[in-house]
Amino acid sequence: MLKAIIIVLFLLLIVAAVIGFYSAKTTLSIPRQTLDGARRWQEDHYDISWYDELEKTDYTVSSYDGYLVHVQFLHNHLPADQYVIISHGYTDNRFGALKYAKMYLDLGFHVIIYDLRGHGLNEETFCTYSVREARDLLTLIEDTRSRYEGIKMLGIHGESLGAATSVACLKYHPQIAFVVADCGFSDIFGVLENGLKASRMPAGILKLTSVCAKIRYGFSLAEMRPIDSLKGNEIPVLFIHGADDPFILPENSERMQAETSGYSELHLIPDAVHAESALKDPETYAAVLREFLQRIKDNL
């Protein structure tokens, strides 16, 4: 009888391990869009004809661990001493940043867009939902300051995973003037829990997934908490979130705003779902951004 119980427990352990490692692989994998596919999506949803007319410079930056990040610099046709680095969302690539790039160009910024780790033209790898990605962004900030002279204002702007990455980067106290975080998550556990509720899957699978992710990839889901980077933060942050976002709930931005120590704003865009605030109400979005940046400039 004891032998049978041991065999059953052993089989259950094997099943749990298979489920856990499969779940970890699925959760941390990146279904990549091609650059052409991402560009077509942008063209179908708003005008990007201005992009082809820009002077652009492509280059790569070696991150903290030697990983190469593909970057594109969008030159403002006007003399500018303001720069912004825009981080796109999960599965997307640099073209996902274009919906924000035009706003910054119109405000007199040079714009830097890039492919996040594991996305776009970069080498395939797994996603750590802001952990490694934040260190990549820090490297880009440092590279930008060394590459371009006369920078008076440098900020970062992110959408979804890019927003979480931008917030998580604050733990390193980067030399930047502002952060714009659009529909970012405060911790990946909450996003996945929300998804499990919708699919009626047992919540306990997340803990198993987290353990297996740590074993296989070296990072647990519990480490993927951008909100922890806001403790003691004094860099101004503009949080924007679609009021009807069903994927990353607006309360993520609300919690993060409550956590930061510095100046912050939170704007919920009515009727906007995930990552579509700038498309749902571009005029309001541009006005909120312009007024926030003016307040930052007035206090520099």
Where are these regions (language model features)?
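An N-terminal hydrophobic leader/cap segment in hydrolases
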Residues: A4-S62, Q72
